[in-house]
A protein has these predicted regions:
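Phosphate-handling substructures
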Residues: 62-120
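Generic structural signal for well-ordered alpha-helical scaffold segments
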Residues: 37-40, 122-126
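Active-site-proximal alpha-helix that buttresses catalytic centers in soluble enzyme cores
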Residues: 2, 7-66, 112
Length: 126
């Protein structure tokens, strides 16, 4: 039986400030690096990562002697107009309220919908 582990990248500055960080290619922050150094996982047979720097850095810290394969389709969702902003910065944006009211079912303005992101991610697993 094949086991697939989905591991979220370590903390970034954007995460620290509760920003929507999707296509923004930012590195791990020092705290994120330190936290990852205290985590261990069993050695996997293969490692597939997003092309984003934070994901590659996470894999390198967790599995330092293993080769990683970059899969473009595994990249995070494109948050469009909400990218690199947090809820406080978006609170007066009517598009943000409409997205909230839709329970996140609407596409991000100028970005992807959950369905588009999921379909792209699924392609990466095939």
């Amino acid at each position: 039986m094949i086991k697939i582990w989905l591991i979220r990248h370590g903390m970034t500055e954007g995460n620290r400030h509760q920003r929507y960080i999707g296509v923004t290619d930012e590195p791990l922050c020092p705290e994120g690096i330190e936290r990852l150094k205290n985590i261990t996982y069993p050695k996997p047979q293969a490692i597939f990562v997003s092309p984003l720097r934070r994901c590659q850095e996470t894999a390198e810290i967790l599995f330092p002697e293993q080769k990683v394969r970059i899969i473009d389709q595994l990249a995070e969702c494109d948050f469009g107009a909400f990218e690199n902003k947090n809820y406080k910065e978006l609170s007066d944006d009517p598009r943000y309220q409409a997205w909230i009211d839709s329970n996140g079912m609407m596409a991000f303005p100028g970005g992807e919908s959950k369905e588009e992101c999921a379909a792209r991610n699924l392609e990466g697993f095939q």
